A protein has these predicted regions:
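Aromatic/hydrophobic pocket-lining residues that form π-stacking "cages" and hydrophobic walls in ligand
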Residues: 42, 122, 219
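ATP-dependent carboxylate-amine ligase catalytic core
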Residues: 1-70, 88
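Conserved catalytic-core segment of NTP-binding enzymes
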Residues: 62-64, 71-129
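Nucleotide phosphate-binding/pyrophosphate-handling subdomain across enzymes
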Residues: 48-49, 53-58, 66-76, 81-84, ...
Length: 228
């Protein structure tokens, strides 16, 4: 339930139960994965509640992910690192090609971090789809406060701010107050835990969900800065 929220509130147990009961035969006959069922649940819930805008996160990769059936108003690709190699490929270029699979015809795409070895993959994919492409780290933004304190969140914030700027250009009514308020309540609105989360100060205990080499390196760097 914590994966599906509207304005920070989790989907109700009744909504989950009703959806599962209505679609269980279909799930069984099509041998859907847990994630695929969850995606269907999210789409159904957002549609029934007539949300103004939905943020849909890819489960793994992009090209073949079950979320990729939608046509978004904006696509966002964060930094690329080695992960899920059994399914996405053993090198960063192969993984980037899978991620680039979410780029849609005439739909703008924000790339969160410029990585020289794969930059051309995203440019070629966007050109093939006539999609405007921007690299978020080419821009400088005001320093906003965020309740997620890991150093790596600076890059994430830069990506978010560029994405919001594009939405503003497409007539979405987002002002600076909305941005300030939203960034201060990321954990509350999303339920995210373990992002350089201070559990205790004396002694200092920190929880971080770093789960691949790149993420661990960021966490290790922040830990060294904290202890120095």
């Amino acid at each position: 339930r914590d994966r599906i929220r509207i304005n920070g509130d989790m989907i109700s147990k009744d909504s989950v139960s009703e959806f599962m009961n209505d679609n269980l035969d279909f799930f069984k006959s099509n041998n859907l994965s847990f994630f695929e069922m969850t995606v269907g649940l999210a789409f159904d819930y957002f549609s029934n509640n007539k949300v103004d805008i939905a943020i849909i996160e890819v489960g793994m990769g992009g090209r073949l992910d079950s979320t990729n059936i939608i046509t978004p108003v904006l696509s966002v690709i964060t930094n690329i690192s080695i992960d899920h190699t059994k399914f996405l490929g053993s090198n960063i270029s192969d993984i980037a090609k899978e991620k680039a699979g979410i780029i849609k015809k005439n739909i703008p795409v924000v790339i969160g971090e410029t990585q020289d070895e794969i930059k051309s993959i995203f440019i070629d994919a966007s050109n093939a789809k006539s999609a405007e492409i921007v690299f978020a780290d080419d821009f400088i933004y005001d320093n906003y406060d965020c309740d997620l304190k890991g150093n790596y969140q600076r890059k994430n914030m830069q990506t978010v701010l560029k994405a919001l700027e594009i939405l503003q250009q497409n007539d979405y009514k987002i002002n600076d107050g909305h941005i300030i308020n939203g960034l201060k309540k990321v954990s509350l609105n999303t339920g995210l835990k373990g992002r350089w989360e201070v559990i205790q100060n004396k002694p200092l205990i920190i929880s971080d969900t770093a789960h691949n080499t790149a993420a661990v390196s960021y966490t290790h760097l922040r830990a060294n800065e904290t202890s120095s």
